[in-house]
Amino acid sequence: IEIESNKREVKKWYQPIIKGSKLAFAGFIIKEFNKTEHYLCRHILKPGSKSSTFTCTANTSNLDTYKYNIDLTISQKKIIHKYFMNRRSNILYNNILSDEGGRFFHSQIRYMACKLKKDENINLPKNYIWLSKNQIITLIDEQKIDIEARLLFGIVNFKGII
């Protein structure tokens, strides 16, 4: 589409609008250790990136077909099913937002956060780690947390600062 703006260095340009899947997913599992909330994060290397980053506990580009997605590990599929699709889970946040502010045509992401009970444990799959709030903030400063995880982390913690 053609874009015109008097608020940018370039006044006119053509912006590609990418059609993604209708509903993607990003979710955090949260658990308290030693009176401090920790977030279960996954260590990843995204295509085109020079260095690795951390992301949410679970992500998929299409929530409707996650069970059949060959790019998701069995562990990721089990996590989505057990903690985010289970009505008995302690869901702290569940909302649908436009993907990257509407840059992707009619594409949305369901963001969810689930808090484990104190006595509830999870077997950590390969590349997973529990990170505290302070560790995540430090990693955000170092640009080591991806956009979905930054957004969900901010949303989950926003109500605590107002």
Language-model regions, residue ranges each:
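Elongated scaffolding segments in large macromolecular assemblies
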Residues: 90-162
